[in-house]
Structure formats: C-alpha cells, structure tokens
C-alpha cells in the first residue's frame, strides 16, 4: 500500500520526539539515550538493548568448526547484528591451537599499540558504546581509520586481553569485524569471564558456547549462569540469535 513506509529525511531530536508521540507503537533500536526517550514518550515502546555476546570455546569442542563458525558469523554484514560474537573465552589447554586456527583463517592479531589505535576508532569512552562512524565498517576501513596496516585479505582483527572491566574497549560491544580474546585456566574460570562480560555489557541479550553437544551437565551449567535471553550452543551467534536457518527454535527477527 502507498505510504506504508515513511521516514524523516533530516532527522533531529525534536522531530524524533514528535514522531514518537504520533504513532501507536515505538520499536526503538539504537543507543541508550534514544531507547530512554522512547520509554519516556508516553507511547507504548519496545526497546532494544546492547548485545555483548561472549563465546566460550571449551576443550571438548571441534576447534575448526568453532573458529569457522565464529568468523562466518562475525563477518556477516561486517558484524552489525547485535547478537554477533564480541569476544571469545578459550580454555588454556587449547588456547594456542585455537589462536593458530584463527590466524590460519586470515584473522589478524593486533599488538597493544595497534589495539589502542583501533579502540579509539570504535569505542566511545563516555557512553561505553560504539562510535557511529565505526558501525559496519570493513576491516580495511577500520585499519585505515586507525592508521595501521593489515593484510588485505584479513577477515577479523583480534586483540588478546585479560581485562574484563567495562572501561576496556575490547570488553564491550563492537559492531564491526573486531574480537576480543580471553584465556581461562579451566571451565569454571571461563564461566566467570563470560558471565561478567555478558552481564556488564549486554545483560539479557546473548551468550554462546562451543563444546561436546552431548555434555548436558556442562551446557546446563552454562545456561543457568548466563543472564541472557539467548543461550546458543555450537551455533554462529549472528545467525542463531536471529533465528531461522541456524535456529528454528527462535522466531526470525533482526530486532533483538
């Protein structure tokens, strides 16, 4: 039908506020300020929160499948889907093997100086959110913006860190092809790291794990510990989180 879709050509805060008062329902996808404005508008609203999906790579998993799935997910639409992996937590006894698999799959590991430069591009320290000009940028665009050089065939840039604090850019949501990487001594520590990252940066959103699919005890421990609406096992989180092809148990939606 005519006029079923319309938009504001030159958006402003005043026009957005006016629009929110004139509609029957608001579906608010955006920053915290915009979601808060929607909830305060007097119009029924559904707000979408940030995702800070951490993925545990357990020593019982198929490493090649796990790494390939994460890269497949993280590179779709340059990582813009909010259910996409933001960092991985790897058990110590397989850490080097997993790292090598990422490297062999054309992921680039940043040193500290490079990581700091990239962080200035994507991370807004005041809001702990993503800078708007970094959304959905390709690896090469991000590298150019940061003033660093990476191989032209790089799929994802990765930074190894042990800092899970909310002030660490790499511990937060990154809606572009960037990953943080953590090492855990054992499964218990992996649960601690994953739970902290998910809760502080994306409570109620998504968490994932790659493991032996028959290990129900481990899967149950993970599911009960994570404060997330979507618990994904052996699944690329971008696709598993939005439902359909990789997860028919969830109704398809790009608004999470």
PLM regions and their residue ranges:
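A glycine-rich phosphate/pyrophosphate-binding beta-strand-loop-alpha-helix module
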Residues: 1-3, 217
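General beta-strand structural signal in soluble alpha/beta enzymes
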Residues: 3-9, 27-30, 45-48, 110-112, ...
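A structured beta-alpha segment of the ubiquitous adenosine-cofactor-binding alpha/beta core
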Residues: 5-23
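Short acidic loop-to-helix transition motifs that present clustered carboxylates
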Residues: 9-14, 33-34, 214-216, 238-240
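Short, structured coil segments at secondary-structure junctions
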Residues: 22, 41-42, 226-227
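Glycine-rich phosphate-binding loop
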Residues: 26-38
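ALDH superfamily catalytic-core signature
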Residues: 35-165
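Conserved C-terminal structural/oligomerization subdomain of aldehyde/semialdehyde dehydrogenase
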Residues: 148-256
């Amino acid at each position: 039908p005519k006029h079923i879709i319309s938009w504001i050509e030159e958006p402003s805060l005043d026009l957005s506020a006016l629009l929110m008062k004139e509609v029957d329902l608001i579906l608010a996808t955006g920053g915290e300020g915009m979601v808060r404005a929607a909830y305060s508008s007097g119009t029924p609203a559904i707000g979408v929160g940030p995702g800070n999906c951490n993925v545990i790579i357990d020593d019982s998993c198929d490493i090649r499948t796990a790494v390939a799935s994460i890269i497949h997910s993280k590179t779709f639409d340059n990582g813009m889907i909010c259910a996409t992996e933001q960092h991985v937590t790897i058990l110590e006894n397989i850490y080097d093997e997993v790292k090598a698999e990422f490297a062999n799959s054309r992921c680039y590991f940043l040193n500290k100086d490079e990581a700091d430069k990239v962080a200035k591009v994507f991370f807004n320290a005041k809001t702990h959110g993503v800078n708007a000009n970094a959304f959905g940028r390709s690896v090469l665009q991000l590298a150019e913006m940061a003033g660093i050089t990476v191989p032209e065939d790089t799929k994802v840039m990765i930074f190894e860190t042990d800092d899970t604090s909310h002030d660490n850019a790499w511990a937060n949501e990154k809606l572009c092809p960037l990953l943080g990487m953590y090492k855990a001594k054992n499964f218990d520590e992996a649960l601690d790291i994953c739970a902290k990252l998910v809760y502080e940066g994306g409570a109620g959103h998504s968490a994932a794990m790659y493991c032996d699919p028959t290990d129900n005890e481990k899967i149950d421990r993970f599911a009960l510990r994570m404060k997330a609406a979507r618990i994904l096992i052996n699944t690329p989180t971008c696709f598993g989180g939005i439902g359909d092809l990789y997860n028919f148990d969830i109704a398809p939606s790009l608004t999470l």
